Amino acid sequence: MSSANDKKAKGTKKNILLLAITRMGDMLQASPTIAGLKRENPQAKLTILVDREFAPICRGIPGIDEIYEIDLAFVCRCLHRDQDGVVDAFEYMEQVVDELKARNFDFCLNMASAGYTAILMKLLEIPDCSGWIADEEGNRLIHSPWSMLFAAFVYHSN
């Protein structure tokens, strides 16, 4: 059942960021979501943030206007390196955050459930976010009742 706020927001998004960076399946499952976002917001620019190794797959998904690649392997290599590895990883991620913030997204959907994507959503300071986000202490939060239900099924299915 749609609320008045859902109907009011329909078609108002102009610059959308979709996070689907943790698994190839996230991207493939994002295809119907991308189609729906474009149908409801036909004038919106849709950027997808993906791990560099999955970018070629995204080029074949209709509705994506821009692919922003992040090199997670580089971040992992940095974090496992001695000396300045942590600094290099921080500087790389700081650059990613700064570049994405400069694009002034008005909506973000996090299709991944990883903790670091929730923190990334928090750092981007996008005014309207759905999916996993982080609070001030880095705890993962979900605001959407449907996402809460999905997470409950996934995380408590054993």
Regions found by a protein language model. Give the residues of each.
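Catalytic machinery of carbohydrate-active enzymes
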Residues: M1-N158
